[in-house]
Swiss-Prot record:
Binding residues annotated for Zn(2+), in chain numbering: 73, 89, 96
Recorded GO CC terms: cytoplasm
Catalysed reactions, semicolon-separated: 1-(5-phospho-beta-D-ribosyl)-5'-AMP + H2O = 1-(5-phospho-beta-D-ribosyl)-5-[(5-phospho-beta-D-ribosylamino)methylideneamino]imidazole-4-carboxamide
Pathway: Amino-acid biosynthesis; L-histidine biosynthesis; L-histidine from 5-phospho-alpha-D-ribose 1-diphosphate: step 3/9
Cofactor note: Binds 1 Mg(2+) ion per subunit.
The protein's name: Phosphoribosyl-AMP cyclohydrolase
UniProt lineage: Archaea, Methanobacteriati, Methanobacteriota, Stenosarchaea group, Methanomicrobia
Organism (species): Methanocella arvoryzae (strain DSM 22066 / NBRC 105507 / MRE50)
Role description: Catalyzes the hydrolysis of the adenine ring of phosphoribosyl-AMP.
Chief location bin: cytoplasm
Subunit structure: Homodimer.
């Protein structure tokens, strides 16, 4: 296995749908998230804002099943191809990239956040 380089303890990750190649999200992994992703086949990330590890889908049930992991030429960025359950974005869209810079919604809404993220 090619060992990634974690700059300041983090590794940028681009996530794409395995079949359509749609870009679903961008996140970071720390070493623990990387190791858990490799060992479980379910994507784990590190939340910079919350300062903690997170298993994608742990709250929503919208897991990312890892099909393939690719590393860039400098070994400092990952591309993960996943089978996405429902939507990747906490706002209810399939992709976090669901709108243009002008504000036009171009993505597919796949769930209502209020129905999923109940306190």
């Amino acid at each position: 296995m090619i060992e990634p380089e974690f700059k300041d303890g983090l590794l940028p990750v681009i996530v794409q749908d395995y079949e359509t190649l749609e870009v679903l999200m961008f996140a970071y992994m720390n070493r623990e998230a990387f190791d858990l992703t490799c060992s479980t086949g379910i994507a784990h990330y590190f939340s910079r804002s919350r300062g903690k590890l997170w298993k994608k889908g742990e709250t929503s049930g919208h897991y990312q099943h890892v099909k393939e992991m690719r590393i860039d030429c400098d070994r400092d960025c990952l591309l993960i191809l996943v089978e996405q359950d429902t939507g990747a974005c906490h706002t209810g869209y399939r992709s976090c990239f669901y709108r243009t810079i002008e504000g036009d919604v171009v993505g597919e809404k796949t769930f209502e956040p209020a129905d999923v993220y109940k306190n």
